[in-house]
């Protein structure tokens, strides 16, 4: 799988994507990353301009982004084109499967006040949000999307069960975890986890996941019902 990123700040990549299991996946060829500097396509050294109609901030130019997209598409045969935006469709765990199947995915990292809508309309660009909050740019959001997708690529995670037991696989959060020491600051590991009884351990984990979901994400419980 290949991710192609359009960004004003290419130096931030791969960043955290270059370490741990995601970084090993990159080094071992399970996925690849191409980073294209938007400033390479600047017009008179500018990539933005003042918004028509007035208002705060600057807007990224459609012609600049269009040239950047044309280059990316001709070079990498883009299958999905995505603009990271707080007003986009919310990116959830189930979104990863569709992206992984797309192979060549373009992630466009915005800056300033926004991008000229004509660029999004002309190239039929999807808008995707990683949450109901605003970031200074799309780079962190792009990294989150890439990380979430790459760990779903077969072979990247050493243990497939790790993926199957995670939060949002199904409609609940992940169960609580414990490791050594058995007792810490007067707090003990639940005895059932040390019992060796796999049926009881499985039941405990189901209940633990349900408790965590009801406490931290009651909206997921409501959606399921």
From Swiss-Prot:
UniProt KW Ribosomal protein keyword: no
Keyword Isomerase: no
Coiled coil start-end: none
Residues the record lists as binding S-adenosyl-L-methionine: 110, 130-135
Keywords recorded for this protein, A-Z: Cytoplasm, Methyltransferase, S-adenosyl-L-methionine, Transferase, tRNA processing
Catalytic activity: guanosine(37) in tRNA + S-adenosyl-L-methionine = N(1)-methylguanosine(37) in tRNA + S-adenosyl-L-homocysteine + H(+)
UniProt EC number: 2.1.1.228
Compartments it resides in: Cytoplasm
BP GO terms, sorted: tRNA N1-guanine methylation
EC top class, as a word: transferase
GO MF annotations, alphabetized: tRNA (guanine(37)-N1)-methyltransferase activity
GO cellular component terms given for this protein: cytosol
Biological function: Specifically methylates guanosine-37 in various tRNAs.
Quaternary structure annotation from Swiss-Prot or TrEMBL: Homodimer.
Recorded family membership: Belongs to the RNA methyltransferase TrmD family.
The protein's name: tRNA (guanine-N(1)-)-methyltransferase
Lineage start: Bacteria, Pseudomonadati, Pseudomonadota, Alphaproteobacteria, Rickettsiales
Gene behind the chain: trmD
